[in-house]
Amino acid sequence: MAKSEEARAPKRPMWTGSIAIGLVNVPVKLHTMVFDKGIHFRFLHKDDGQPLRYEKVCTKDNKVVPWESVVKGYETGKDRFVVFEKTELDAAKPESNQTIRLQMFVDYLSIDPIYLDRPYLLTPNKSDDAYSLLSTTLKKMGKAGIGRVTIRDKEYPVLIYPYKNALVLTTLRYPHEIADPGQLEELKDIKEPSSEELALAKKIVTDLSGEFDITDYRDSYQEKLTALIEKKIKGEPIVAEKPVQPEAKELMVALQETLKQLKKK
């Protein structure tokens, strides 16, 4: 039951609009680019092993509410709401609901990775002339465009850059969505390492330095989970083995022994 690791084709577009650069208009379609290939379990009723379903139940009369009777509301107080129709919510949609206006261009590597959220694939819509021009220009100059887009009732800052023969849009996180490490007590007043510790740590990093290749990495948890499922299907017993914890060592000793192990390779 192993799942194929072949690359998947993008699904149908989830957004259609255009990229605007001054008076230049680039018609595009936005596709999901990241897929969850993990194993998923369903919740079952323990007594009979049948799957559970979830329903929208009114908290007042405990009756199941059909989807056509569901509206959105904003809570103004305990059990007090103002109700919005879809047409009313549409009034709040900004220009970025249909147009990604690029406001500036930056070096792609100048963006702190902490702000990178989710990548989407941009494809040309109807005409590809302007799309090709933008993609080629960004690729030759090593630049990325900064703009905004509204997806599913939220406006995101975005980064648009070339990837292979396409353009990719990555949504960015707002500063207030990122935790401030300085607020954690554990990170306050951390002492500086000794010069000896730092020297050994630098040697370890140097010895382990190399070129990153994502294909070198596999999801070992999913592979083991697949093997367990196959055992379960065959009715074979499953025994959980506890991982062996490495012996705790004093920092300098651990650094020195790590260097020795690396030299043996």
Where are the regions a protein language model picked out?
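Boundary segments of small protein-protein interaction reader/adaptor domains
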Residues: 1-265
